[in-house]
């Protein structure tokens, strides 16, 4: 069959802005949650909360919208986390890139599973990332650090994930079907 050149209307500015907003939403929400967690409120465990929010956001969006959570975007979120946090530069970047890699690698299996299994896998990934961050920080600062903050970070991440996943799932569903939002 012969293909005839057709006339296609140009995409409107509103349509292009809508597509850009949908594409950037996962990165923007993760960055905004990271900034909100970094506000100086004087809460105990606020550094662990900040790292937990970044881990949960990157894991969730890498699992359910990997096209919008590219490694470069994860790198920039990790750089923001390093600039806002207390760890040596590069620790947050490396841990978030590894979390992203695990989520993308296991995506096909995990997206078909129930929430409890995804939560369990996230808790294991968050615990591994916390141990990695603790170890890298100890090596880069040449000090043996107490393991308590790493344990607290893993527990906060595991406890925070259901609430964040609920909010991010609602946002994800409204992105997928804007007419029902």
Model-derived segments and their meaning:
Residues 1-181:
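Terminal, non-globular segments
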């Amino acid at each position: 069959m012969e293909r005839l050149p057709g006339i296609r209307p140009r995409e409107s500015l509103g349509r292009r802005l809508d597509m850009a907003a949908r594409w950037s939403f996962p990165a923007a929400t993760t960055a905004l949650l990271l900034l909100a967690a970094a506000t100086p409120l004087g809460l105990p465990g606020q550094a662990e909360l900040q790292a937990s929010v970044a881990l949960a956001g990157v894991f969730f969006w890498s699992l359910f919208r990997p096209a919008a959570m590219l490694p470069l975007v994860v790198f920039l979120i990790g750089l923001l986390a390093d600039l806002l946090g207390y760890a040596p530069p590069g620790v947050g970047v490396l841990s978030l890139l590894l979390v992203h890699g695990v989520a993308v690698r296991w995506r096909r299996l995990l997206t078909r599973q129930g929430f409890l299994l995804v939560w369990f896998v996230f808790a294991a990934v968050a615990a591994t990332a916390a141990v990695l961050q603790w170890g890298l920080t100890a090596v880069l600062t040449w000090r043996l650090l107490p393991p308590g903050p790493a344990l607290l970070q893993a527990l906060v991440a595991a406890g925070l994930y259901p609430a964040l996943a609920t909010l991010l799932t609602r946002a994800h569903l409204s992105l997928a079907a804007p007419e029902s939002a």
